């Protein structure tokens, strides 16, 4: 197993519910360290750029609208198999299909307002981390 980094976004619906701390606690209890974190209100341009791979999909406009509807918490998580571990903690994209005890099962309402985003691969993670954070903003903590 390798120490990896992954990007996590706590989406506007979860921020509005005041469950930021509960979500971060789950990451930490699972052995992931927060090595960078900031709260931002994404612009249409920033959200659209982040989700550019979906630009031609029918849900793109609604996705950008949702992601700009309120502040988000963007963070870099570091730890053994961080990408897979984060995805397991999040649960299925559709909260109705997410296993009990996952972040989405506990805090999400719909497939659109599904509480969190997580990188789907180490390659995506590297690209997504660089999109939101400079090297100087990431503080390694793994020993």
UniProtKB/Swiss-Prot annotation:
The active site is at residue 117. Coiled coil: none annotated. Its cofactor is Mg(2+). The keyword ATP-binding applies. One of its GO terms (cellular component) is cytoplasm. It comes from the Bacteria. The keyword Secreted does not apply. Pfam families: NDK. It catalyses: a 2'-deoxyribonucleoside 5'-diphosphate + ATP = a 2'-deoxyribonucleoside 5'-triphosphate + ADP; a ribonucleoside 5'-diphosphate + ATP = a ribonucleoside 5'-triphosphate + ADP. It is found in: Cytoplasm. GO terms for biological process: CTP biosynthetic process; GTP biosynthetic process; UTP biosynthetic process. InterPro entries: NDK-like_dom, NDK-like_dom_sf, Nucleoside_diP_kinase. One of its GO terms (molecular function) is nucleoside diphosphate kinase activity. It is an enzyme of class 2 (transferase). ATP binds at residues 11, 59, 87, 93, 104, 114. Its EC number is 2.7.4.6. Keywords: ATP-binding, Cytoplasm, Kinase, Magnesium, Metal-binding, Nucleotide metabolism, Nucleotide-binding, Phosphoprotein, Transferase. PANTHER family: NUCLEOSIDE DIPHOSPHATE KINASE, NUCLEOSIDE DIPHOSPHATE KINASE DDB_G0292928-RELATED. NCBIfam families: PRK00668.1. Homotetramer. Belongs to the NDK family. Major role in the synthesis of nucleoside triphosphates other than ATP. The ATP gamma phosphate is transferred to the NDP beta phosphate via a ping-pong mechanism, using a phosphorylated active-site intermediate. This is Nucleoside diphosphate kinase. The gene is ndk.
């Amino acid at each position: 197993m390798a120490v990896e980094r992954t990007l996590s976004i706590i989406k506007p619906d979860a921020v509005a519910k005041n469950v930021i701390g509960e979500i971060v606690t789950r990451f930490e209890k699972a052995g992931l360290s927060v090595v960078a974190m900031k709260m931002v209100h994404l612009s249409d341009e920033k959200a659209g750029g982040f989700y550019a791979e979906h630009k031609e999909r029918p849900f793109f406009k609604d996705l950008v609208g949702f992601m700009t509807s309120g502040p988000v918490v963007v963070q870099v998580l570091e730890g053994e198999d961080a990408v897979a571990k984060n995805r397991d903690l999040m649960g299925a994209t559709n909260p109705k299909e997410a296993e009990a005890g996952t972040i989405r099962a506990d805090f999400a309402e719909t497939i659109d307002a599904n509480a969190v985003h997580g990188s789907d691969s180490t390659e995506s993670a590297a690209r997504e981390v660089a999109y939101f954070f400079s090297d100087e903003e990431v503080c390694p903590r793994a020993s």
